[in-house]
Amino acid sequence: MADNLAPRRKKMRLIAEARYERIPEFIDVRGHLIAQLLPKVRKSVPNWQAQEDKILFVDSEKQPADEFVIAFNRMSVILEDPHSVNEFADIARSKLRLAHEVIGKDIPTIARFGVRFISIFDAPEFHTHAQLTKHIAEATIRIPDAVPLKPTDSLVRLVHDQGVITIGPASQGEE
């Protein structure tokens, strides 16, 4: 699928996260995890830090763009400005698989798995809420012809340095 918003995107961060039941022995196995994982991930995320509730592997301590987190109740891969979504998917799959090989026996079930896309856009030509809402809906909402859905509403939540903007009516008539 073509990325219609790519020319306007200033930054993008993709996050893949698996959540699971807490591992009670996590504090006791952190050293083992680091010893097993560091040789395999050192090329992309050479810096690591063991904290009370997680182990953080990063490519840079000052401004990380590639992060790999293993915690007592979740593991995640965070990548900033990947070349493509496929590149991100390959990296996330690889790192999550490595972690699962080491601590998978302690995780009976993955309770939730999710992927988040966070983007920052440059859109100086939009001066009103209605203009921006219409543009976002037209540029991002694509429903395949085979799916018999006709959207009647949309909602986009944008968090910025001064607060939060919610774009789109929450229900019919709130336009």
PLM feature spans:
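General N-terminal targeting signals
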Residues: 33, 87, 94, 132-134
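Aromatic- and glycine-enriched beta-alpha-beta binding-site module
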Residues: 78-122
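Aromatic/basic-lined ligand-recognition segments
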Residues: 112-175
